[in-house]
């Protein structure tokens, strides 16, 4: 008989049991469910709602159940529906009627809200640690490539010269924001919903703050309806993870391009590449491709959560059972991607000479020649037009701007002097951009110093 079966004249059909059950995926929350129940039982005893002996027996029995689960001695039952009812059923089978007192002042509605918050906050901590590893990897790579000149791109067309350090530190900033978003998400998640009951709280004199303190929550929810029906924290986490995966996907795309023979900017380590079953010469960037592909999977989890919640009236509805597989899969996917991605980035070989050669083509110093004319007193728009014509001339004559003679330069503007050759060198183009946020070495060194300071401050 179901623990809630008193109102029913007959049991549920087996098809309903299978359809209704969530134990196959919510069993991963067993530890959090039991720890929440231990804290609840402790509070019930301290508040005199059950006796101290009963509270002690329940707590010790729950600890034994936890140990038995972790030792693989317990098989969960589908007809017990979920992790909450499975644990309670086992408890009652071991200590009888005393076990039936555990659920006093509690509903599965606030119980599951507690469990999933506890589970996800642990996962946030784990993911933050993985992001921190990636951030460290990016800093190390940047520090090793402060003078590695490469083309910066817009529209995937060569635009202006930068350094690989500057490029990778751009990703540092992205993943730093991801880390900070996870911290913010944690703070909103870390609120105790237990005590909200089914939807309207309880008449028992519970001490919610005692439970919150024991379980490490910062506060308790202030509205019982919201406490049991809120899944914003899961949606927010899925959103944070989607943005994180978007950043992984962008860097993946660049690694895929850079490792191609068409670019040949980097070579992936053999340990993070794969081959072809038919083409012996192939060395494929499968890690980057899978990270790019799995991004859509995490997006799908976010859309699932939003769709599940979009039309639900207050308070709890069974639809909300669908939240778990979506957020669990998003978490699992991100945790699978981050470590292997960090190792791939950390072990890839940079082909500095190819990057430099690419920066020499595509007229990446054209903006600097325009700026050179501006410094000589020519309005920027006029300078822009002059250099545009100069680029066209070079294209038609198959030469780089650097290869033009002084006579050729003078044909476009008599303001151009011999110092132009120094001013438009790739090294000068990069070193001249000293503003905060620019690619000049001294600016990038400061950015790396700030990055290290941020990383050292992480808890």
From Swiss-Prot:
Pathway: Amino-acid biosynthesis; L-arginine biosynthesis; L-arginine from L-ornithine and carbamoyl phosphate: step 3/3. Its main location: cytoplasm. Pfam families: ASL_C2, Lyase_1. PROSITE patterns: FUMARATE_LYASES (PS00163). InterPro entries: Arg_succ_lyase_C (IPR029419), Argininosuccinate_lyase (IPR009049), Fumarase/histidase_N (IPR024083), Fumarate_lyase_CS (IPR020557), Fumarate_lyase_fam (IPR000362), Fumarate_lyase_N (IPR022761), L-Aspartase-like (IPR008948). It comes from the Bacteria. GO terms for cellular component: cytosol. GO terms for molecular function: argininosuccinate lyase activity. Keywords: Amino-acid biosynthesis, Arginine biosynthesis, Cytoplasm, Lyase. It catalyses: 2-(N(omega)-L-arginino)succinate = fumarate + L-arginine. Belongs to the lyase 1 family. Argininosuccinate lyase subfamily. This is Argininosuccinate lyase. The gene is argH.
